[in-house]
């Protein structure tokens, strides 16, 4: 019979870094509230949570890299919103942020949960930040908890 390794949804004793972009802050702050709610509900001590605010989504990957390099965190949660406008700026920012965050996770070995919304409209972002479509900040924190515990089980 194979051994199955799964992460549990228990944040007790885990340390989390959260990075949130200030651009579109009305969305970012709701995502942050959702992430903090998930962490605390699942046993995280607020003393083991550090939040870094960056100017916008484009700065998230570098801040994630700096956090991961400290070795202080069991998982990092990235939050923000990139909303499509009339120019191709959205395409460049959304692609680079997602690639940058993925590279940090792969290069550092630290679990990084991607909670940066990439939406076509403000309404879609609002829906994903705590209304119709749930709160992706909450979901990202759940991913961070589970993955951090999974990694502890892989020896």
Swiss-Prot record:
Positions contributing to 5-amino-6-(D-ribitylamino)uracil binding: 23, 57-59, 81-83, 114
Name used for this protein in its record: 6,7-dimethyl-8-ribityllumazine synthase
Residues annotated as the enzyme's active site: 89 (proton donor)
Pathway given in the UniProt record: Cofactor biosynthesis; riboflavin biosynthesis; riboflavin from 2-hydroxy-3-oxobutyl phosphate and 5-amino-6-(D-ribitylamino)uracil: step 1/2
Recorded GO MF terms: 6,7-dimethyl-8-ribityllumazine synthase activity
Task performed by this protein: Catalyzes the formation of 6,7-dimethyl-8-ribityllumazine by condensation of 5-amino-6-(D-ribitylamino)uracil with 3,4-dihydroxy-2-butanone 4-phosphate. This is the penultimate step in the biosynthesis of riboflavin.
Enzyme Commission designation: 2.5.1.78
Top class in the EC scheme: transferase
InterPro entries: LS, LS/RS, LS/RS_sf
Annotated family: Belongs to the DMRL synthase family.
GO CC, any one term: cytosol
């Amino acid at each position: 019979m194979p051994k199955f390794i799964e992460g549990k949804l228990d944040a007790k004793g885990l340390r989390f870094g959260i990075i949130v972009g200030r651009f579109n802050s009305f969305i970012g702050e709701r995502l942050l509230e959702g992430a903090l709610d998930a962490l605390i509900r699942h046993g995280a001590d607020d003393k083991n949570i550090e939040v870094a605010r960056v100017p916008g989504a484009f700065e998230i990957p570098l801040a994630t890299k700096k956090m991961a390099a400290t070795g202080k965190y069991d998982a990092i949660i990235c939050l923000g919103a990139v909303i499509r406008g009339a120019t191709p700026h959205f395409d460049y920012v959304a692609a680079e942020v997602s690639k940058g965050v993925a590279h940090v996770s792969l290069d550092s070995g630290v679990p990084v949960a991607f909670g940066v919304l990439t939406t076509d409209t403000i309404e879609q972002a609002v829906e994903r930040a705590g209304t119709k479509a749930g709160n992706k900040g909450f979901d990202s924190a759940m991913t961070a908890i589970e993955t951090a515990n999974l990694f502890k089980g892989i020896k």
